[in-house]
Amino acid sequence: MWNYEKRLEYPIKIKNPNPALAKFIISQYGGPDGELGASLRYLSQRYSMPYRNVAGVLTDIATEELAHLEMVATIVHQLTRDMTMEEIEKAGFQTYFVDHTAGVYPQAAAGFPFDALCLASKGDAITDLSEDMAADGATA
């Protein structure tokens, strides 16, 4: 099915914690327009495609989105590891820290947990592909 390489698609090496920045980037992980939703969208919609090659393209895209998810998680992890209490308080990171410490949790920047309501899978190829283009900001 997949061949997982134990390395990131692009190396990420953040040396200094920055929980204030992590608060914003976490939305790309689990927010309404984030990589988690994108990967689930494509993996779910592939089954409504009438042609195997189109379903294969959606699987390829979903796999790429999962690679993005891994990179965003790595960024958040590196921005929040080894934080001091002073950094946590200064960044306003306490509410996240109370529930997740420095764990990477899928949520929007506003603190709302990931919700699958941000994606659609209608079982109709045209509807699903139109939703994909809208979600990715493409124009037809």
Where are these regions (language model features)?
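Non-heme di-metal
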Residues: 1-140
